[in-house]
Every structure is written in C-alpha cells, then in structure tokens.
C-alpha cells in the first residue's frame, strides 16, 4: 500500500461547491477544467468518466490543483468495498463514497481500510437515497418509508459505523444536522442556482437555500459546466454564498 498525501500538492479552497464533471470526451473535460480555478471549487468524478479515462484522469486534475470527490458509490461485500476504498485513498482523493444500503459490516470495513492513511485519508461518505428517487421508486423496492425517513435511517447507520457523513437531499439537511450534529458532513447533489433547469433531479434547492439548511458540500453540474463563462458563474455562486453565510 502506498500512502498518498491527499492535499500536499493541491490548492486549498474554502468553497463548499463541488462541480460534477459529466463529459463523454476527455478533451472537452480538460478544456472546461482549464477555465476554472481550484480555489473556487472541488471536482466530482463519477462512474462514467472514471471508467472512460481511469485513475490517470484523476491524477491530471489533481496536478492542476483540484481536490477530487471520487463518486463511485462502492456497494459490494465488505472485503471488496474496503479494498476499493483503500485504492481510492492511494490515489489521493479528497472524498470517496459507498452505498449505506451495503450495510453496517461493509461500511465498517471501508472505514477501517482508511485507518493506515491517518490524516491523509479521504473523507468517507455514504449515499442514502439517490436524489432522483421518489416514494414510488422506494415502494418498487419494497421500502414503505418515505425518501426522507429512509434516508434518515441509513444516515443513522452511517454515523454508527463511524463514517464522516452522508450524501443526502438538501431538504433532509436541516433535520440531519439536528439529529446527527454539526460534525457529520452533508453532501448534497441536486443543487441548482436560481433559474437553472432541474434536469434529472427531483429534489433540488438553490445554493443559498442549501447553505441555510446546513449542507456542507453542494454538488453543482450543468449550471457551471454548460455556462458560457464557468469561472464567472463559480465566482458569482461563491459570492452569493458568502453573502448568505
């Protein structure tokens, strides 16, 4: 195992914004990245881009100064999930996630896999209920709880297992901060600046609303990546968040 410092060569940002990179083309992705400043956001790399371009793509983003949220949502037997999380830590990412529905043994194994990395370990976050899911989707899976209640149950299990926080909808953030405390990190997709298209997300909020609700890190995709001036869009979002703080 090679222990890799997670931030020694990268810029430090206080922004809660994490930009979701969703590109089919590597050159287009890098052209976008070269327009923005790592002091203004972190970047999220998901399944499609990681499968297409591999760990080297993550390394290239890190070399440009960006902290990386590796959004692969590991969900497997405990041993396999633990090795995958350790591999992400070896890569030096800032954050990695697993599915809370993988259960307590899987999450505990993932957490234990990061112990050797010490202070250089990435944040370990669990996914509760995907923001695209509604009550009818859960019912199809035999879950009779509402998305909010089911997410809270999974978040409680996540905290019990010692993880750093959860991915949840912004609507759940107020309740989660009350129940799980300020140190339990909340990462929220489905964030759209005022006037943006909701896209394929069902439960959305503006950045200002998310900050007020207690969200620690907010994932924003197309409103930034499809902007004619993404650098200015990021600066405007961050300025608005600072005014709202």
UniProtKB/Swiss-Prot annotation:
Pathway: Pyrimidine metabolism; UMP biosynthesis via de novo pathway; UMP from orotate: step 2/2
Gene3D superfamilies per record: Aldolase class I
GO BP of this protein: 'de novo' pyrimidine nucleobase biosynthetic process; 'de novo' UMP biosynthetic process
InterPro entries listed in its UniProt record: Aldolase_TIM (IPR013785), OMPdecase (IPR014732), OMPdecase_AS (IPR018089), OMPdecase_bac (IPR047596), OMPdeCOase_dom (IPR001754), RibuloseP-bd_barrel (IPR011060)
Gene Ontology cellular-component annotations: cytosol
Molecular function terms, GO-annotated: orotidine-5'-phosphate decarboxylase activity
Entry EC no(s): 4.1.1.23
Keywords, sorted A to Z: Decarboxylase, Lyase, Pyrimidine biosynthesis
Binding site for substrate: 22, 44, 71-80, 131, 192, 201, 221-222
Reactions performed catalytically: orotidine 5'-phosphate + H(+) = UMP + CO2
EC supergroup of this enzyme: lyase
Active-site positions on this chain: 73 (proton donor)
Family designation: Belongs to the OMP decarboxylase family. Type 1 subfamily.
Subunit composition and interactions: Homodimer.
Physiological role: Catalyzes the decarboxylation of orotidine 5'-monophosphate (OMP) to uridine 5'-monophosphate (UMP).
Protein name: Orotidine 5'-phosphate decarboxylase
Organism: Escherichia coli O6:H1 (strain CFT073 / ATCC 700928 / UPEC)
Lineage: Bacteria, Pseudomonadati, Pseudomonadota, Gammaproteobacteria, Enterobacterales
């Amino acid at each position: 195992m090679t222990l890799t410092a997670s931030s020694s060569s990268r810029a430090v940002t206080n922004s809660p914004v994490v930009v979701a990179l969703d590109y089919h083309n590597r050159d287009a992705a890098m052209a976008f990245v070269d327009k923005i400043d790592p002091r203004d956001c972190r970047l999220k790399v998901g399944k499609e881009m990681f499968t297409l371009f591999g760990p080297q793509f993550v390394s290239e983003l890190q070399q440009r100064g960006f902290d990386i949220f590796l959004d692969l949502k590991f969900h497997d037997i405990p041993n396999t999930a633990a090795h995958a999380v350790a591999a992400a830590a070896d890569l030096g990412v800032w954050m990695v996630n697993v599915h809370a529905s993988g259960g307590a043994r899987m999450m505990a194994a993932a957490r234990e896999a990061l112990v050797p990395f010490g202070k250089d370990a990435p944040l370990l976050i669990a996914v509760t209920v995907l923001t695209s899911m509604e009550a009818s989707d859960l019912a199809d899976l035999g879950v009779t709880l509402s998305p909010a209640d089911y997410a809270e149950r999974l978040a409680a299990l996540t905290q019990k297992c010692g993880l750093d926080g959860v991915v949840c909808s912004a609507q759940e953030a107020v309740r989660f901060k009350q129940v799980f405390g300020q140190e339990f990190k909340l990462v929220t997709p489905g964030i759209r600046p005022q006037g943006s298209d909701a896209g394929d997300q069902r439960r959305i909020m503006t950045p200002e609303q998310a900050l007020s609700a207690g969200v620690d890190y907010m994932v924003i995709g197309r409103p930034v990546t499809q902007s004619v001036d993404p650098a200015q869009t990021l600066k405007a979002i961050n300025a608005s968040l600072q005014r709202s703080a």
